Amino acid sequence: MSQHYQHDVLVIGSGAAGLSLALTLPEHLRIAVLSKGELSQGSTYWAQGGVAAVLDDTDTVESHVEDTLVAGGGLCREDAVRFTVEHSREAIQWLIEQGVPFTRDEQHNHEEGSFEYHLTREGGHSHRRIIHAADATGAAIFNTLLAQARRRPNIELLSQRVAVDLITERKLGLPSKRCLGAYVLNRESGEVDTFRARFSVLASGGASKVYLYTSNPDGNSGDGIAMAWRAGCRVGNLEFNQFHPTCLYHPQAKSFLITEALRGEGALLRLPNGERFMPRFDPRGELAPRDIVARAIDHEMKRLGIDCVYLDISHKPAEFIKAHFPTVYERCLDFGIDITQQPIPVVPAAHYTCGGVLVDQHGHTDVPGLYAIGETTFTGLHGANRMASNSLLECFVYARSAAADMLQRLPGTPVPESLPSWDASQVTDSDEDVIIAHNWDELRRFMWDYVGIVRTNKRLQRAQHRVRLLLSEIDEFYSNYKVSRDLIELRNLALVAELIIRSAMQRRESRGLHYTLDYPDLLPEARDTILVPPIYGD
């Protein structure tokens, strides 16, 4: 039997954004936090870098704002950048109060400033402003926030729950369009439960799984973006997908990034015949910026029809390699690759979704009662290219802002009345899951080949034709068979793929992370790509 649940706030996603919002709300509110798999399966846990914030006396808000605007290729919304940076210090202070074990500065009286925690500097930042917990910041933050949430009796943490779709007044045939909750698959019972809430929050991460190679966990299938679109929310700048240049290429090695520090220490990129190729693309060779290296690798893979290229540091002494890169050395050894003697097979991998659901500074979407926070959103902070360590900051700042806004609106927002149960009377168990597996593989392959790092009009047109055929097949399957996690994710991923393709076709220039051979130059005016759903408006 399916279940009915009632909460004040329903949070779809258990990462940095979702947990922060739940913990910021007062303890008298009943809150549900849903995770598709185990609670730790989101992107937050795997984030290695840190959180960018203005913390040291030598740094300024203006400097952080300017660095972000430059990285964003003219498309950042300055009000969103300023709002995020101005609230960065208090967000970090809140994390410290929660107990996050950030790395302290052993030389606290160092000349550069007076902040007691160690700050690093990353690409694009003009100051040391990245607060971190060694090289596993995401895990430290996630474990701390999860432990705090488990201490709160008002926060219900529910794993193995996959949101199928949002429930809105419009979908129930009512005149307005408020969000009332969601239908959620319980993977343990196989039933679709009904969750009703005064406010619903999409905090479900990005959509990098739309590509064949990704550095993200399996769950990043664009669920929040797809559900918001179907509910009537606009989306923006989905053509901007960030790619990391070197992910380990091995059938068993899911999502393992090979740090850029290897190239910093002299590692060379080679073709299968051993030839170096980076000097042909940039005088800095392997030390060129991330997007240039990713494009060069992509070009060579397409030109030669090869599956990967090779990163070679074997010309360095073995002891040097083991001392400087113990994690990479051990992990590659697990897969039978001794990096002291042989090159590492690598491919670029989809890393971050810069666009998403349109929201304001409080996380409001176009649908009343529905908020969105984190990588699911398009706030205007990242523009055409995300700067390192701004993404976690965005999660905390917007989660806290959304929570404050909810508190103001709660007195005038009643709990929705009883909602209809999920209707599974017209569907049967699938005996053709091979269709899901085939469509899944086809989608991720053509998105990688045609809508990846380098694009052309013809590639985008081919991709659009194929994705529309897939959407038709998936909709038919969805109408006839019981839902599963794979089917829900495939349905969402195909929709987001179509939105990415449509966004890319509208941008007739090369800007930031969107690079097309047919329009290699910048247009004089920078404009966002905003897509409007069929049911947008009243």
From Swiss-Prot:
Gene Ontology MF term list: L-aspartate oxidase activity; nucleotide binding
Database matches in InterPro entries: FAD-dep_OxRdtase_2_FAD-bd (IPR003953), FAD/NAD-bd_sf (IPR036188), Fum_R/Succ_DH_flav-like_C_sf (IPR037099), Fum_Rdtase/Succ_DH_flav-like_C (IPR015939), NadB (IPR005288), Succ_DH/fumarate_Rdtase_cat_sf (IPR027477)
GO BP of this protein: 'de novo' NAD biosynthetic process from L-aspartate
Cofactor binding, note field: Binds 1 FAD per subunit.
Places the protein is found: Cytoplasm
This protein's pathway: Cofactor biosynthesis; NAD(+) biosynthesis; iminoaspartate from L-aspartate (oxidase route): step 1/1
Cofactor names: FAD
EC number: 1.4.3.16
Leading EC class: oxidoreductase
Main subcellular location of this protein, as a coarse class: cytoplasm
Reactions catalysed, as given in the entry: L-aspartate + O2 = iminosuccinate + H2O2
Superkingdom, taxonomy of origin: Bacteria
Active site: R290 (proton donor/acceptor)
Site (Important in orienting the L-aspartate substrate): E122
Residue numbers binding FAD: 14-17, 36, 43-50, 223, 375, 391-392
Family, as annotated: Belongs to the FAD-dependent oxidoreductase 2 family. NadB subfamily.
Task performed by this protein: Catalyzes the oxidation of L-aspartate to iminoaspartate, the first step in the de novo biosynthesis of NAD(+).
Protein name: L-aspartate oxidase
Taxonomic source organism: Pseudomonas aeruginosa (strain ATCC 15692 / DSM 22644 / CIP 104116 / JCM 14847 / LMG 12228 / 1C / PRS 101 / PAO1)
Lineage: Bacteria, Pseudomonadati, Pseudomonadota, Gammaproteobacteria, Pseudomonadales
